[in-house]
Amino acid sequence: MINTNMKYWSWMGAFSLSMLFWAELLWIITH
């Protein structure tokens, strides 16, 4: 259970970081 929970949170963290990265990159390109 702990292993599954850690995988879930690490995946969420990686996903949110990548989304922030792409949002920042698009902002720089479009502005």
From Swiss-Prot:
It is a single-pass membrane protein. Keywords: Cell inner membrane, Cell membrane, Membrane, Transmembrane, Transmembrane helix. Its main location: membrane. GO terms for cellular component: plasma membrane. Induction: Expressed during stationary phase (at protein level). It is found in: Cell inner membrane. Pfam families: YmiC. The keyword Hydrolase does not apply. The chain crosses the membrane at residues 9-29. It comes from the Bacteria. InterPro entries: YmiC-like. This is Protein YmiC. It comes from Escherichia coli (strain K12).
